[in-house]
UniProtKB/Swiss-Prot annotation:
Maturation and modification: APOE exists as multiple glycosylated and sialylated glycoforms within cells and in plasma. The extent of glycosylation and sialylation are tissue and context specific. Glycated in plasma VLDL.
Cellular compartment(s): Secreted; Secreted, Extracellular space; Secreted, Extracellular space, Extracellular matrix; Extracellular vesicle
Protein name as catalogued: Apolipoprotein E
Molecular functions per Gene Ontology: cholesterol transfer activity; heparin binding; phosphatidylcholine-sterol O-acyltransferase activator activity; phospholipid binding
Signal peptide limits: 1-18
Repeat positions for Sequence: 77-98, 99-120, 121-142, 143-164, 165-186, 187-204, 205-226, 227-248
Annotated organism of origin: Tapirus indicus
Keyword Disulfide bond set for record: no
UniProt-annotated stretches for the region Homooligomerization: 259-310
Residues holding heparin: L159, R160, K161, R162, G222, Q223, R224, L225, R226, G227, R228, L229
Keyword Transit peptide in annotation: no
Name of encoding gene: APOE
Top-level lineage group: Eukaryota
Similarity-based family: Belongs to the apolipoprotein A1/A4/E family.
Amino acid sequence: MKVLWAALVVTLLAGCQADVEREPEVQLGNEWAKWQAGQPWEQALGRFWNYLRWVQTLSDQVQEELLSTQATQELTVLIEETMKEVKTYKAELEQQLGPMAQETQARVSKELQAAQARLGADMEDVRNRLVQYRSELQAMMGQSTEELRGRLNSHLRKLRKRLLRDAEDLQKRLAVYQAGIREGAERSVNTLRERLGPLVEQAATVRSLVSKPLQERAEAWGQRLRGRLEKVGIQAGDRLDEVREQVQEVRAKVEEQANQMRLQAEAFHARLKSWFEPLVQDMQQRWAELVEKVQLAVGTSPTSESSEKQ
């Protein structure tokens, strides 16, 4: 999206002066190729990079293409593909959190749906901001380039803050989910022990009241019951450890993806800044040359008129 804005800025500024050289095509190299393989969401990100690269290869038609609805339509398709991959990942996450209690699982599913809705709203906001920013650029043709650069830098800072805030919020939610899963599993084990405890005591009472053969049977039955109880406790503990490991794996994946998003945002900010600053400096130099030419032309005009009168 930032590259799309940069291409739009280059095109509009180039249209202000006829003798300005065209911006050379930005070569992304192998940076996009690494997203073609891997998880589905990585492939969707690769298609997004491919679209940005295509925008950069436009020359004479770039202004007409960007000012039309084509860019918005292409962005809509990318949003739909990304949301589809998000839904798939959400279903996979819910499957990994399946052993939780139904009440907790329903709450987790509801919160994940809310997070998904916020993500869709953010992407729609990006698309709407593109349309709004495109209109603002058309109205800023006569204003200072410093103001334009300041607006771009401000938007990039806000985008990075939003990514960091969303990543931290997701980490906190995962910590809450892990604590809820552990508490629910421990509560289930305690409930099971409370239900089986009276049965063990009842077996001991029967054993003391009956004769020796019956007492031996009751003792054997009590031993089997205790063995089953211990087995159930061990299984419940193993299940709790398994659930805890699954939650830790999910949390590690999310933290890794959040770190990748942060690094990509920082690299994107530095790359856009390195592209835009040379353009602004070149425009300032050309503007100074144009002002100097106009001043020279104004200074020589009275001299020419005096020569013609003589």
